[in-house]
């Protein structure tokens, strides 16, 4: 098992990943690879941050999950009522895929509308492969007021299409 508290608790940069490897041969091979790549050091800050997150972060995490669920429902409801954008409800993440294929657009035009008209920058679907054509990914890990502003800009832009 390879894991870290990085994304869940927003402590990236603290060198806090860890491995649980029961098989002694695999563990030794893994340790050798870490040493060869100069990735074997433990960060005191990362260790403490991970321990604090796992030990004391449960209530905070439950509250965060509720905030994200509220944000997801907001995006689904707004775009479902106000646009032809299909929202793919995420599972276990704060990244939502938006499907713009109901509009008669090219990928280039979609990006131009988002950037120049709506004044938002989303992850281009094509960056994830051809099946991402006419899709974009929005990160909802932001204050609700900012999410509302971003989504309202998108709604206003695509109301004209």
Which role does the model predict for each range below?
Residues 1-161:
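PLP-dependent class I/II
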